[in-house]
Amino acid sequence: MTLLQKEYNDVAYISGPLLFVNAASDLPNGAIVNIKDGNGKLRGGRVISVSDQNAVIQVFEETRGLDLATASVSLVEDVARLGVSKEMIGRRFDGLGRPIDGLPAVVAEQRLSVDGQPMNPAARAKPEEFIQTGISTIDVQTSLIRGQKLPIFSGSGLPHNELAAQIARQAKVPGHEGDFAVVFAAMGLTQREVSFFTQEFERTGALARSVLFLNKADDPAVERLLTPRMALTTAEYLAFEHGYHVLVILTDLTNYCEALREIGGAREEIPGRRGFPGYMYTDLASLYERAGVVEGKPGSVTQVPILSMPDDDITHPIPDLTGYITEGQIVVDRTLNSKGVFPPINPLPSLSRLQGNGIGKGKTRADHKNVADQLFAAYANGLDLRKLVAITGEDALTETDKLYLKFSDDFENYFIGQGDQDRSIDDSLTVAWGILSKLPQSQLTRLSKDSIDKYYGTKMDEMWKGGRSSI
């Protein structure tokens, strides 16, 4: 009898979604198994822990109806694998890679381990090519670079789903539009959110260049742990086998981490900070570090993970550990959202550590870096003056101070609050110059004289103030 035919019948006990099987130490960790009940019904599962005494299996479906005396386990695959193909573009799948769009299953060109292959650090190329998202605050002030991992920190009730859909719809690498693809993985979605993403991708035509993996809130927790790995395996295949520049959007990583905590609790592991497992940093790194550019390979994998910070706390373990691994952050702001500004991205706490690699002359525009610095300084000054006015009133302000107050309002309404507009980097810089031109030239200390001579005096346009289409 071979291992592939072997059945394990000594199920010791069942705890929630977990099966503990005795005398199964020869099962590979991470293997996919079938669990058969006394009536012959099969359920899928994954081995999540193996010791000398037993194996722990997370069941993909409910464990109701499983009996210790009649349940048996058999090996299906030594590791979780996904059948991948270029034909996956334009398709929708569930969190385990099964089609949910009513079309036949994809004919796999390869079956790849969802854990991926480690990327040789010596083979990594330096990320230095600009990705245009069409969103001014990101493109000008926290630029996304091909091969980067740049998370979005949001909060409960903020429009990060709409922002994710807008990035998926608009993102492109200038000059490489034909070989650009989006892999979108959403975890822990409500039925309303599933409908939103499905309709939004179809309505805007973004589905034609996208692969969607949608995991619902009522799906098993272990499926939530596999969903981003399914997405990243697909992205790596498209990038390094077919030369695509792939943007991977993962939302919401908070749901992923809570599934990690749920399984850790069921396994009776010793918890770490706020109940999350101590290995959460390593687990998140195994996702984030799959982004990058490889020497000699035409494609690339860029990641934009999105997470909602519990209680808007940026020191919470999930954003805290994410910040250690990734290369910056984009912060969605509740105050801006309450003013009706969309997308409500606050540039002051936002940062892209690789921005300097991919902007400037020959990449975006020569004045890009200086304009970003000037916008940051002027907006920060305007917000400080708002706090002062709240205490002392406007009587103590100079004329220049009043111009800075007006600048901060215009910056939020015209530059940040672009709505559903898809702006090129030139369009975004034009908007920036139109707002900066309301300040005296003497205040533009971060801009070169050549840039001021060329662009100062750009007229503002009411069309810059964006609106939002109703879905």
Swiss-Prot record:
Pfam family of the protein (one): ATP-synt_VA_C
Gene3D superfamilies assigned to the protein according to its UniProt record, in alphabetical order: 3.40.50.12240
UniProt keywords, alphabetically: ATP synthesis, Hydrogen ion transport, Ion transport, Transport
CDD domains: ATP-synt_V_A-type_beta_C, ATP-synt_V_A-type_beta_N, V_A-ATPase_B
InterPro entries (UniProt xref): ATP-synt_VA_C, ATPase_a/bsu_AS, ATPase_F1/V1/A1_a/bsu_N, ATPase_F1/V1/A1_a/bsu_nucl-bd, P-loop_NTPase, V-ATPase_su_B/beta
NCBIfam families for the chain: PRK04196.1
Organism in which the protein naturally occurs: Deinococcus radiodurans (strain ATCC 13939 / DSM 20539 / JCM 16871 / CCUG 27074 / LMG 4051 / NBRC 15346 / NCIMB 9279 / VKM B-1422 / R1)
Protein name: V-type ATP synthase beta chain
GO molecular function terms attached to this record: ATP binding; proton-transporting ATP synthase activity, rotational mechanism
Reported function: Produces ATP from ADP in the presence of a proton gradient across the membrane. The V-type beta chain is a regulatory subunit.
UniProt keyword annotation of Iron present: no
Gene Ontology biological process: proton motive force-driven plasma membrane ATP synthesis
Encoding gene, per UniProt annotation: atpB
Protein family: Belongs to the ATPase alpha/beta chains family.
